[in-house]
Structure formats: structure tokens, C-alpha cells
Regions:
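Transmembrane-helix signature of polytopic, membrane-embedded enzymes
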Residues: 32-40, 197, 217-240
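Membrane-lumen/periplasm interface segments of specific transmembrane helices
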Residues: 123, 130, 303-304, 311-401, ...
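Membrane-interface alpha helices of multi-pass inner-membrane proteins
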Residues: 234, 268-269, 280-296, 302-307
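Membrane-embedded, hydrophobic transmembrane alpha-helices
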Residues: 1-105, 448, 455-460, 488-503, ...
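Transmembrane-helix motifs of polytopic, lipid-linked glycan transferases
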Residues: 75-84, 201-224
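Hydrophobic, aromatic-rich transmembrane alpha-helices
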Residues: 210-221, 310, 384-411, 415, ...
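Membrane-interface helix-loop-helix junctions at transmembrane boundaries of multi-pass membrane enzymes
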Residues: 99-104, 222-230, 275-279, 314-321, ...
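Membrane-proximal, lumen/periplasm-facing interface regions of secretory-pathway glyco-
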Residues: 131-136, 710-753
Length: 796
């Protein structure tokens, strides 16, 4: 019964949104497709659901599932009547596309379709098994939803600062308490349908959002007269983008919803501008406006959408308006006018060192150098696959092509994105969110659908304008350019790795785990290694004992160990030298089964080493097997082995996964996306050099870009399959409310449940703090577990 009511609660608003959109477009005789209407109808229906829940609470000061569901059903009636009376039926295939004629393109279509379904299946596994995972979700968005569920109303919450100052006005407090409630209400709605708070199923709307996005993107592509293979390729590129896939899988974040409204709103604006369909521009503007109900940053995207619309529809007027605005600001600054009061909106301008923006509040001015952070995330990290290199190639190709609507769309969209990034990060104190990589990827994620849609429009335009035919005499095989690019890339990689080797010839120092002596904690021999079975105050220390070692000759550490999934939070390698025997130097590593580190780059690794060892962290009942500790001279072969291991290493979900991603080891010497991007760039250069001797150079460049993306996605999908297996294995063992991250939350949850039983009044407020002041994660998790008991998290 619970699953039935959940399905009814989630599908009814979706169908209501679809019926309304399809009915309006059908009654107006507009050319529209069923898949696009289903996809966009989902977001329209859920926007209406949010309004219904908020209005019901405002009228009754309570929440009741069946009355709200009945109101939602009544709101579906006008859309259903319009749908039944529409003049034109919906359709799926566009008149201009038809089926793909080439067998190769049909294979590509079904490959992308199958891979898209696989990505959605992996998302479903995470949603169904994993409890709410991201930090922002359970400290803010879903903390508020959970509090509302137990309170039975959309009660106000305080910011933690109000409680810290001793002036609370609400029963609960949470960071971002003043943010719009859309994300929280959707999780609350799922809980109301279930009749209980289920930390996994409350995120089920996020899975439906992913399905709706795929439908909307494919449908919009077909309406734009893209061939089926290209529309499906775009849908696959969307759902296979690692950062989007991660947000879908982990749930609880507002970024998915603001991407649904802003991203597809901009898609509608672009599609309407390119094809001259004004109703799509209006619909796109409405979607962007709905983003105001998700996050305050929707104001920025609304301004960006207005600018994009102006550039697309009236480029000269928009350019003149921007220029006039700059002139007015310049004159005001020269005249000493730095801020003005806008009636009903508040102050806009600069007062002292603070920037005031209507609806967004005030923020400090600052100037940060963020280009290295953008390079690390957009070119080296795994959050985007090859999105940014492909966009750069598209811009380069458009520079040599004739003006067109797709070209104007891509250039305008990237300029708008650049302007928003500069406005948010480059010149204000919010730049620290980019510098710390907290939001540097999440903000561009909001416009990902529009970026990909503009990209495939450009690809289609370039293919249509290309003139395939017989090349000049001496035609070359298409494989020459990518093979030459591969050879150059490999040669460059080998030269880079070889240049970092000192060339010292020395036998390595090979210590088995059994050669290390436990001086804190206890364990037992396990083959040639040692198994740590007990941790003393949470740590175990293994020492080599006294030795004499020339650090300059053995500068590479290789460590192999095995541990349980919940074990080994982190580890440290330590050493002492003759120059300062009392000082212990150490470097810390994340949890993994194999570590290779260049000690020569570490502070303190110099002179003669007289002792070395390991510090392992764990808890009661956990074990760690230390197999070997090797100190070796640096070599090209060793670097290549380490690089391969780093590229194929599986990095489990972490609390930063919704901010940035590294599919392999985050400390790899060279990251695979950068290598693939270099190969793509060099291959494209060879294609350009040989363009007169190749039959279809444009098609070849597009094929190379797709091949590079598929290569990276093979690794990403493999990692996702491993992650799904780990998730099912961990959370399938009973009702586990604690997260599979190495923090000791399992024992925290037991203490929370015990203390709840000792409380005289469940309505009492709890104060959660830590003795050592460095356990912010556990403090906030305790606050979440204490619900419905109100509490305050004292951190620091």
C-alpha cells in the first residue's frame, strides 16, 4: 500500500503537468512532441505540486496527504479537458528526421539508448538502497523536510546563528533555513505518501527527474529536426556526465531541480530562438522563473536568461542595452554615485566594500585568481568527461564558419555562463566557494542541458554544411589522424614521466608486513604480513625499528594493504632522521589498497632515515592487513604501473562527490581526462592538416570527440558498477541508517538512540558538541538522527 500511494503521489503531478502542456500546445495547433511534453511536464507538474502544498499549509497550518492529493487531482482536470480537446495529436518522431539510414548510425543509436538506460538503472540502485548522503542534503534541505514531516506543518526554522546568539524564534534550526522550500517539500511529499520518513525513498522524485530529463532532451532534439542518433547521443551525453549522474544518484540536493528549470528553460529559449517559435521562448522563461522557488540564485539565472533571450532574438538591441548599462555605471561611478535604492526591491550598488544586489542581499567584494581551479576541474577532473574540450573545439570550428543561429546560440550561452561565473565568483567573497571547489562545478551544472543542446545543434549544422565526397588524389585512411595523435600523446606522456626520474640505480628496500613491529594496538601474523585486530584509542602504530637509510636513493613509497570497507579511514607514513631524531615527520593518505608516493617531494624526507612506519586508524572490531612496505628508487616503469593503478582505482562516494569528482586516484601524476583531451586536440590538428586528403573531416572530428567521451565513460561506468555493488552489499544488510563513510557514525547512531531513551521529555532540546572540536561531520549527523527532537550543533 505504501508503494502504491508513493507511486500515485509522484505520478499524478507528472501527468497533470504533461496533460496541461500537451493540451495547451495541442489547442494552439503547435508542432510539439510527446517525449518533450512528458519531460517538461514533469517539472511543470512538480512546480504546481509545490504551490499546492504551500497553499494548503498556509490555509490550514497543517499537512495531510489525501486532501492535498485530492487538490492536485482537481488541478489536473483543466489540463485533461484541454488535452482531450486538442486540435493536433502529440508525436514522437519529427517530420524532418525519420529513421537513421546508416547501419552504423543505427548501432550508435541503440548503443547510446542502452547505455543511457544503464546509467538510469545505476541511479535507481543508489536511490533505492542508499540513505540521504550529501552533506548539504542532511544538514539543510532534507533536515528541514524531516522536521516538517514530524511537525506536521511547514513551520519556520532559524539559522544556527540565531541560536548561537541566544535568540531562537523557532523550534528547529538549520543552515540555509531561509532558502526557498521546493527541494524540501518534494522530499516531504514522498514521506507523507509513505506515512513515514524513509531516508532512501524520499529521494525517489530525483530518479523521476533524471528520466524526465532524458525524455525532454531527446524530444527537444527531435523537434529541432535532429536525426534520431544525434538526439539520442545528446541524451546519453547528458545522463552520462559524471557530476549530473552523481547528483541524481545521491539525491537530496537542490542543484538537480534548478538544473531542471534553468537548464531546460534555456534549452526552450535556444530552440525557440533558432526555429522562430516564440511560444517556446515564453515557456522557457516560465521554467527559469520557477527556479526562484528552488534557490535564491534563481535571480541570477533569470537575469542570464533575459540576456540570452535578448542576444538570440535582438542581438543589436541587447548589445546596445549592455553598452548603455556599462556607460551608465561608469558615469555613476565617476560622479560618486555607487548605489541607488530601487522601490520595492532594495538597494543595488556598492557601499564600502559590500556589494548589494536586490533579492540576493549583500556580499563582500574580493578578487581571487581562480583560473588554476577552473583548469583543474574542467580539464583534469572527472566531473565533466570531455564537455569543455568539446565546447572549445566547437567554438574553434564556428570561428571559421558562416554566421548561423546555432553558432549564435552557443557563443551567447557561453558568454552568459562566463558573465555569471565572473559575477558570482571572480569579484565577490563567494569566490571562496570556487577556490575550495565547493561550487565551481555545481553552478555550471545548472546549464548543462543547454550547453549540450547547443553543442549538438552546432554538430548537426557543421555536418549539414560539410560536403563529403571523394578526397583529392592520394586519399588517406581515416585512422591515420587518430593514430598519429595517439602516438604523439603517448610520446609526450613518456617524456613527462621520464623527466621526473632522478636516474638513481639502487635495490629497493622490501619490508613485509611481518617485518614491522606493533608498538600501539595489537595484531597477529597473517602469511608474510601482519593483521591489525585491535586499535588503541582508535590507532595502531607499526614501526620498522632502528635502521639506516639514505633517503636520496630510495624516494618512492609503495604500500599494499587490505581492509574491510568500513575500516581504515586514513593512514600515515612516518619517519625520523638523524638531523632531528626527536621530530617525527609524516604524510597522510586516503583509504586505498595500494599507495605509491614520491617521498622526495615531501617536506622532511632528506638525510639519513633511522626509523619509519605506519599509523593506521580504526575502531573496535575492524581489521587491516598490512602486506608490504617497499621503498624503491624512482623509475619510468614504476611510474607507468602507478599511473595505470591510479587510473583504474575505484574512488567510493564521499562528501565532496557532489562538488567535484575524480574517478581514479585524485593524486594521480597525470589525470586520464587530460590525456584524452590532449589526444583529441592533437588528432584534430592532424585532421586539419590532412583535411584535403580525407573524405569527411568534419564527421571524423565528431567521431573522435564521441570516441573520447565513450572511452572515459567506460571507466566511469565500471566505477559506477563497482559502487552499485558496494552500495547493495553495505545497505542490503538490514536497516542501516548510517552512511558508508569512514567516520564512526555507526557507533554515533547507537549513542543517539541510547540517549533518546534516557530523555524525560522527547521535546527537550539537545546540544551536540565534541570534546576535541574536530568532528563536525558527526555533530551534524547526530543532529539529523535526533529528529524529531530539536537540537543545536556546536562546532569548532
Amino acid at each position: 500500500m505504501e508503494i502504491f500511494t508513493l507511486a500515485l503521489a509522484l505520478l499524478l503531478p507528472w501527468m497533470g503537468g504533461y496533460l496541461l502542456l500537451a493540451g495547451v500546445e495541442g489547442r494552439c495547433g503547435l508542432r510539439a512532441g510527446t517525449l518533450r511534453q512528458l519531460g517538461l511536464g514533469f517539472f511543470l507538474g512538480y512546480a504546481a505540486l509545490y504551490g499546492i502544498v504551500a497553499l494548503y499549509d498556509a490555509a490550514t497550518n497543517s499537512l495531510a496527504f489525501w486532501p492535498i492529493l485530492s487538490l492536485a487531482a482537481l488541478c489536473c482536470i483543466p489540463g485533461a479537458l484541454l488535452f482531450l480537446k486538442r486540435d493536433t495529436p502529440g508525436w514522437v518522431m519529427s517530420a524532418g528526421g525519420g529513421a537513421d539510414s546508416s547501419p552504423l548510425l543505427r548501432v550508435l543509436f541503440w548503443l547510446c539508448a542502452a547505455w543511457t538506460l544503464l546509467h538510469l538503472l545505476l541511479v535507481a540502485i543508489e536511490i533505492l538502497w542508499r540513505p540521504t548522503f550529501p552533506w548539504d542534503a542532511w544538514t539543510s534541505w532534507l533536515y528541514r523536510a524531516k522536521a516538517w514531516f514530524y511537525a506536521g506543518a511547514l513551520i519556520p526554522l532559524d539559522e544556527p546563528a540565531a541560536w548561537l546568539e541566544g535568540a531562537p524564534t523557532a523550534l528547529y534550526n538549520a543552515p540555509g533555513a531561509s532558502y526557498p522550500g521546493f527541494t524540501s517539500v518534494l522530499a516531504l511529499w514522498s514521506a507523507l505518501a509513505l506515512g513515514q520518513w524513509n531516508d532512501s525513498l524520499v529521494n525517489f522524485p530525483v530518479l523521476l527527474a533524471g528520466i524526465a530529463m532524458v525524455m525532454a532532451f531527446y524530444g527537444q532534439g527531435r523537434e529541432a529536426d535532429l536525426p534520431p542518433w544525434l538526439a539520442m547521443l545528446g541524451s546519453y551525453l547528458l545522463v552520462s556526465t559524471p557530476l549530473l549522474s552523481t547528483h541524481l544518484s545521491l539525491g537530496g540536493m537542490a542543484d538537480i531541480w534548478i538544473m531542471g528549470f534553468v537548464g531546460f528553460g534555456l534549452v526552450e529559449i535556444i530552440a525557440g530562438s533558432v526555429r522562430g517559435e516564440r511560444y517556446k521562448i515564453v515557456l522557457g522563461a516560465c521554467l527559469v522563473i520557477f527556479a526562484l522557488a528552488v534557490k535564491n540564485e534563481g535571480v541570477v539565472w533569470l537575469a542570464a536568461a533575459a540576456l540570452l533571450c535578448g542576444v538570440m532574438r535582438w542581438p543589436r538591441i541587447a548589445g546596445a542595452a549592455v553598452l548603455a548599462g556599462c556607460v551608465v555605471i561608469g558615469i555613476a561611478a565617476l560622479s560618486g554615485i555607487h548605489s541607488v535604492e530601487l522601490p520595492g526591491l532594495g538597494q543595488i550598488g556598492v557601499v564600502g566594500d559590500r556589494l548589494h544586489v536586490p533579492l540576493l542581499g549583500e556580499m563582500g567584494l574580493a578578487r581571487l585568481e581562480l583560473w588554476d581551479d577552473y583548469l583543474a576541474n574542467f580539464m583534469q577532473g572527472d566531473s565533466w568527461h570531455l564537455l569543455w574540450p568539446l565546447l572549445a573545439l566547437a567554438l574553434l570550428a564556428l570561428a571559421f564558419s558562416r554566421p548561423s543561429a546555432p553558432r549564435r546560440a552557443l557563443v551567447a550561452l557561453l558568454c552568459v555562463l562566463l558573465a555569471t561565473q565572473l559575477a558570482i565568483f571572480q569579484f565577490t567573497e563567494h569566490g571562496q566557494w570556487a577556490e575550495e571547489w565547493t561550487a565551481i562545478n555545481r553552478v555550471p551544472l545548472h546549464v548543462l542541458p543547454a550547453l549540450l543542446f547547443a553543442l549538438i545543434l552546432v554538430a548537426h549544422r557543421l555536418c549539414a554544411r560539410a560536403r563529403p565526397g571523394e578526397a583529392e588524389s592520394g586519399k588517406m585512411h581515416w585512422s591515420l589522424a587518430p593514430l598519429a595523435g595517439l602516438a604523439v600523446t603517448i610520446a609526450g606522456l613518456l617524456l613527462y614521466l621520464d623527466g621526473s626520474q632522478p636516474g638513481v640505480d639502487r635495490e629497493p628496500l622490501n619490508l613485509h608486513g611481518g617485518d614491522l613491529r606493533l608498538i600501539a594496538g595489537s595484531g597477529e601474523q597473517h602469511g608474510d604480513g601482519v593483521r591489525v585486530t585491535d586499535f588503541q584509542n582508535g590507532i595502531a602504530v607499526l614501526s620498522s625499528g632502528a635502521l639506516v637509510l639514505d633517503s636520496s636513493r630510495l624516494s618512492v613509497l609503495e604500500l599494499r594493504l587490505r581492509s574491510e570497507r568500513e575500516s581504515q579511514r586514513r593512514m600515515r607514513f612516518f619517519w625520523r632522521t638523524t638531523s632531528d631524531p626527536q621530530r617525527v615527520s609524516a604524510i597522510e593518505f586516503p583509504s586505498r589498497d595500494y599507495v605509491r608516493s614520491k617521498l622526495g617531494e615531501s617536506v622532511g624526507w632528506h638525510g639519513t632515515v633511522i626509523e619509519l612506519g605506519l599509523i593506521l586508524f580504526g575502531e573496535a572490531g575492524e581489521t587491516v592487513d598490512v602486506d608490504s612496505l617497499i621503498l624503491a628508487p624512482s623509475s619510468l616503469g614504476g611510474s607507468l604501473r602507478t599511473l595505470w593503478h591510479d587510473w583504474t582505482f575505484h574512488e567510493s562516494w564521499g562528501q565532496t562527490s557532489t562538488n567535484f569528482l575524480f574517478v581514479g586516484a585524485s593524486d594521480a601524476a597525470v589525470h586520464l581526462p587530460l590525456i584524452v583531451a590532449v589526444w583529441l586536440a592533437v588528432s584534430v590538428l592532424f585532421v586539419w592538416m590532412l583535411r584535403r586528403r580525407l573524405a569527411s573531416p568534419v564527421a571524423l572530428v565528431i567521431a573522435l570527440g564521441v570516441a573520447g567521451w565513450l572511452l572515459l565513460d567506460v571507466r566511469w561506468t565500471t566505477s559506477r558498477l563497482q559502487q552499485a555493488s558496494d552500495t547493495v552489499a553495505f545497505y542490503g544488510q538490514g536497516d542501516r541508517a548510517y552512511l558508508d563513510v569512514p567516520t564512526g557514525e555507526k557507533y554515533l547512531l547507537q549513542r543517539v538512540q541510547t540517549s533518546k531513551g534516557l530523555m524525560r521529555d522527547p521535546g527537550d532540546t539537545v546540544l551536540v558538541l565534541s570534546e576535541n572540536g574536530d568532528s563536525d561531520f558527526l555533530i551534524w549527523r547526530a543532529l539529523y538522527h535526533y529528529l524529531p527532537t530539536p537540537g543545536f550543533a556546536h562546532t569548532g
